[in-house]
Structure formats: structure tokens, C-alpha cells
Regions:
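Non-catalytic interaction-recognition regions
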Residues: 1-243
């Protein structure tokens, strides 16, 4: 069942009684004349997202700001609706849906935007060079040893965990299809975004001076961003160029 939070009702101009304002959610009811169109939600989300985008990126043209706001709004709504299991009450709330923190579409989109920004700042051949170096593991003893060192300890364990999580995408999609439960994919996408953000904050990918270690970090970031982008696309959510 889809409902609205009292705050969302007020934002949409739906009049509520004092009793309704105290409820956790307001059920939509045609009989009572309470209803909302998806377009109304998108339009309101776009307005709020545009304000944030214009503040963060005043250098963008109006058209670019509007396009970015639309992508964020659609991502926010789709993720919010998909993150709940089929038998749950979906109490839509604008502030919660558009938050850049927590289990939201914008949070997942922002993680992918961050990942893409890494590769815009790196040399255009950095990824190919990293993959070429990693490809020598097993045939070159020195490189194998250095890669092993880069993947040792707690940091290495976290890198492996991110890689293994990213590689589970196909498995998760298959499970969701079998169970007809897209909420599982939404949860996986959030977990992958959160794992990447942790990786992003703990490692100096662009500034890393050790060539082998940087190659490991670049390869890991690429795997994570490709799988995160694919997971979002499966949910019908695109990744803006900037957020």
C-alpha cells in the first residue's frame, strides 16, 4: 500500500485534520478524495533537487541543472518505492527520499558519481595501465608479491570484501527475479554504495605514490563503479554526471 507522510501531504497542499497530523502515514483513498499522481511527486522532487543542484553547481547552465535535478528526482522516487518489500506500507516522504544520507536513491547515485569523478581526474591511460599490471599477477613474481602486499592486512580485507560484494550483482538479480522481490536489489545497491564510500574515504587513490598499490585501488574502484552503475540501471535509475 502506498501512503504519504503527514509532512508530504502538507507539501502537496493536502489539508489534514489535527488527528491526521498525528498519524505516521496517511492512506490514499479515492473515496475520501485523497490521491496523488506520480508526476506530482516527481515535479515536487525536481523542485527540491534543483535548489540543491543550483547551490552546489552554479557554474552549470540552467538546462544542465534541470537535467541533473530530474535524474536525482526520478532516482529518489524509484528507489524509495522499490526499497520496501511487497507487503509493506510505503509512506512516501520528500525529505527522506531526497536525502543524500542513508538508504536512498541519491545516496547510491552520489557514490557512483564519486567513482566516476576519480576516473575523470586520473590520466586517461591509468585504468588500462592498472589492468595491465594486475594481469601480470601469477606470471611476474615481483608484481605478484607487491600486489599481495597491497592486499594484506585490514585494508586488503576491506578491498577484497568490496570486490566480492560487487561481483554478487548477477546472483542478487537472479534471486530477486525468482522471488519477485526488487527490494533485495535495492538493499544490495545501497550496501555496495556504502562499501564503496568507505573505500573512497580510506584510500588516496589519485594521490597514491606506490604504483602497484595505486593499480590495485584503481582496478577495485572500476569494478565497484561498473557494478554499482549496472545495479542502479537495473532499478531504472541513471547516474548524473555531477551531484
Amino acid at each position: 500500500m502506498v501512503a504519504l507522510s503527514p509532512a508530504a501531504c502538507e507539501e502537496l497542499g493536502i489539508q489534514l485534520s489535527e488527528e491526521d497530523r498525528k498519524k505516521p502515514y496517511i492512506e490514499m483513498s479515492g473515496r475520501k478524495g485523497l490521491g496523488v499522481k506520480a508526476d506530482d511527486l516527481i515535479n515536487r522532487l525536481e523542485e527540491d533537487a534543483l535548489t540543491e543542484v543550483a547551490t552546489r553547481h552554479p557554474q552549470l547552465s540552467v538546462e544542465e541543472q534541470s537535467a541533473t535535478a530530474h535524474e536525482i528526482a526520478v532516482g529518489a522516487l524509484r528507489y524509495f518505492l522499490l526499497k520496501f518489500t511487497r507487503n509493506s506500507v510505503i509512506a512516501f516522504d520528500f525529505k527522506e527520499a531526497l536525502s543524500f544520507e542513508g538508504e536512498t536513491g541519491p545516496y547510491c547515485q552520489y557514490a557512483a558519481v564519486r567513482a566516476n569523478s576519480i576516473f575523470r581526474k586520473l590520466d586517461e591511460n591509468a585504468l588500462n595501465s592498472a589492468n595491465e599490471l594486475i594481469g601480470k599477477v601469477g606470471s611476474d613474481k615481483d608484481i605478484s608479491a607487491k600486489v599481495g602486499e597491497a592486499l594484506a592486512g585490514e585494508a586488503g580485507t576491506e578491498i577484497w570484501a568490496l570486490i566480492m560484494l560487487a561481483q554478487r550483482l548477477d546472483e542478487v538479480i537472479a534471486q530477486c527475479a525468482a522471488a519477485a522481490e526488487p527490494a533485495n536489489l535495492a538493499k544490495y545497491t545501497f550496501n555496495l554504495a556504502r562499501a564503496f564510500n568507505l573505500f573512497y574515504h580510506r584510500h588516496r587513490i589519485i594521490a597514491e605514490e606506490d604504483r602497484t598499490r595505486q593499480a590495485v585501488l584503481i582496478a577495485t574502484a572500476d569494478i565497484a563503479r561498473r557494478q554499482l552503475t549496472a545495479a542502479l540501471a537495473t532499478l531504472g535509475i541513471s547516474v548524473p554526471e555531477r551531484m
